[in-house]
A protein has these predicted regions:
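Internal hydrophobic scaffold segments of catalytic domains
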Residues: 1-10, 91-93, 160-161, 273, ...
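The feature marks proteins involved in alpha-glucan
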Residues: 1-52, 64-68
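Substrate-binding/active-site clefts of carbohydrate-active enzymes
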Residues: 49, 58-74, 78-224, 232-259, ...
Length: 286
């Protein structure tokens, strides 16, 4: 799966809404070195849940008042002493998956990032330049410095839907590869939606859950991330026809994955389809 994306300067979301040729304005994948995180020099802090104090932040807004000429991730390094002084043990970064800033109505900007177009790549706007390799190194450095300060890094991850919208939305990634595999689609050919964003990922189908597991492993082993908070996590427990599953295969895979054993897992226990599992979440480790 692509670890890097390029083409943002020429990207136009509207050109992916129909069947016209859009090679000149679509995003391109970049092959990157899958370098593993250096846990020997920057080991995980591994704070117990009892002593964990989480500081949730958006990387762009948190660093907005610092030097405008530096990237968000570089500016964040200057704030680590402040976070350490607060006494927190972990930061929870609001979505940093690559997302579409133009996925917003009436010419507005999508600021928060809850509209991913790739589950393996950090968002381009938070870096110094467009080099995918340099971007990966920059985020890895952030995690290294947090570990040095005894601070864990938790990511707010969005696997329940994507930026491709409903059946009339743009074909950016998953939709163009195999929309019938990745999304729940009704007999009327319309996308079924319990995310409130136009589509819902069919997370318990074999190839889809494998992709999600590989994404989690990527952030854990290649970037050194210490935990994940699943946006609308209970939506990931739905099976065919959006039926809730008692033992969702995805959660079983996460629970049994050796590379995720020491990872902190947090989840929202609800979705926009009315499913609510507070205190009864179908995963032993979440």
């Amino acid at each position: 799966c692509s670890r890097g994306i390029t083409g943002w300067k020429s990207y136009k979301r509207e050109n992916a809404l129909n069947t016209q040729e859009n090679t000149h304005s679509c995003l391109k994948s970049v092959v990157c070195d899958r370098k593993l995180f250096n846990f020997k020099d920057y080991p995980r802090p591994k704070h117990s849940w009892e002593e964990t104090i989480i500081y949730e932040l958006h990387i762009k807004s948190f660093t907005e008042l610092i030097d405008k000429n530096e990237s968000c991730f570089k500016k964040f390094l200057k704030k680590i002493p402040y976070l350490k002084e607060l006494g927190i043990t972990a930061i929870e970064l609001l979505p940093i998956f690559c997302f579409d800033p133009t996925d917003a109505p009436n010419g507005l900007e999508n600021f928060w990032g809850y509209s991913p177009i790739n589950w393996f790549t950090p968002h381009f706007e938070y870096f110094s330049d467009e080099s995918a390799e340099k971007n990966r190194e920059e985020f890895r450095r952030l995690v290294e410095e947090c570990h040095k300060a005894d601070i864990e890094v938790i990511l707010d991850v969005v696997y329940n839907h994507t930026s491709e919208g409903d059946s009339q939305g743009p074909a950016i990634s998953w939709k163009g590869i195999d929309e019938n595999l990745y999304y729940f689609i009704g007999e009327d050919k319309n996308y079924q939606d319990v995310s409130g964003c136009g589509n819902t990922i069919a997370a318990n189908r074999g190839l889809v859950r494998k992709l999600i597991i590989e994404s989690l492993k990527c952030w854990s082993s290649e970037f050194g991330v210490d935990g994940f908070r699943f946006d609308l996590g209970i939506a990931l427990s739905r099976g065919e026809n959006l039926s809730p599953l008692e033992n969702p295969p995805l959660f079983e895979d996460i629970d049994c994955e050796p590379e995720l054993i020491d990872i902190k897992l947090i989840s929202e226990p609800w979705d926009c389809g009315g499913l609510y599992k507070l205190g009864n979440f179908p995963s032993k480790n979440t």
